[in-house]
Regions:
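A conserved mid-protein helix/loop that constitutes part of the nucleotide-sugar donor-binding site
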Residues: 62, 69-85, 99-100
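Membrane-proximal helix-turn-helix segments that form the acceptor-binding/catalytic region
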Residues: 1-13, 20-22
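Conserved acidic donor-binding segment of nucleotide-sugar-dependent glycosyltransferases
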Residues: 173-174, 178-186, 193-199
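Aromatic "clamp/platform" in nucleotide-sugar-dependent glycosyltransferases that forms part
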Residues: 141
Length: 233
């Protein structure tokens, strides 16, 4: 389908990150530009809003948050395995098939990791959950862009991401979060300890917000970039 599009006159192919654009080139042999996604920033405000609930969820603290439907591609089982022995529980947001969630619960129990599977959350509820977390973590495979670190950084919670995929566009290692080797569990545990330090959290949040502002993921900027692509056709 992509090769067919490139054969059409006045056509352009874009990926939502430098990783996605590179993968399009590797797989299809066609040149692709980068068209960053848009993010509505006020859904994850810097300061807690009045609509954010202070309700304590049924999960032992400290906890980390992972986002995405439970499955291999999101690295959900790997995340639980990584947390074993860390003393950190996991709040899983994104649901999944009933059978998969049952297996995930059994896996967490076998690893001694506390697990809370979140119900459907509103944006304020999601922001509150992330704000109270030690970190937001992801071991996703081939994540095209990854909005999760943007959401975490916006509310001031450390983003600990696997050093792969589109996460490299938003996270600069040890500047505004961490990019970590998938198989180095010691590095992940050290990063989770690092994320507990108040000064580190503040420094990463400030650098992260500056990075997001530099990328300008606003809907208006997205429209301007899309218009620029169309103007070049």
């Amino acid at each position: 389908a992509i090769r067919g599009l490139t054969d059409r006159p006045r056509s352009a192919i874009s990926g939502n990150s430098s990783y996605t654009a590179a993968r399009i080139g590797d797989v299809y042999g066609v040149e692709a530009g980068v068209l960053l996604p848009s993010v509505v920033s006020d859904e994850f405000p810097t300061e807690a809003g009045l609509d954010e609930s202070s309700e304590t969820h049924d999960i032992a603290e400290p906890y980390a948050v992972s986002v995405g439907r439970a499955g291999w591609v999101k690295g959900t089982w790997e995340t639980v395995s990584m947390l074993a022995g860390s003393g950190i529980s996991l709040a899983h947001v994104g649901g999944g098939a009933g059978e998969d969630l049952a297996r995930l619960t059994q896996h967490a129990e076998s690893c001694g990791v506390g697990l809370w599977v979140a119900p459907r959350l509103s944006s304020p509820e999601m922001a509150a959950l992330i704000r109270g977390a030690r970190a937001v973590v992801s071991m996703a495979h081939g994540e095209p862009f990854g909005l999760t670190p943007v959401e975490a950084i916006s509310v001031g919670t450390p983003a600990l991401m696997v050093d792969e995929g589109g996460f490299r566009d938003t996270v600069i290692d040890d500047v505004n979060g961490r990019l970590l080797p998938r198989d180095d569990l010691g590095a992940w545990h050290s990063a989770l300890e690092q994320a507990a330090d108040g000064r580190t959290r503040t420094a990463w949040a400030e650098s992260g917000r500056a990075r997001i502002a530099e990328m300008d993921l606003s809907p208006d900027a997205h429209c301007r970039r899309l218009e620029s692509v169309l103007d070049c056709l």
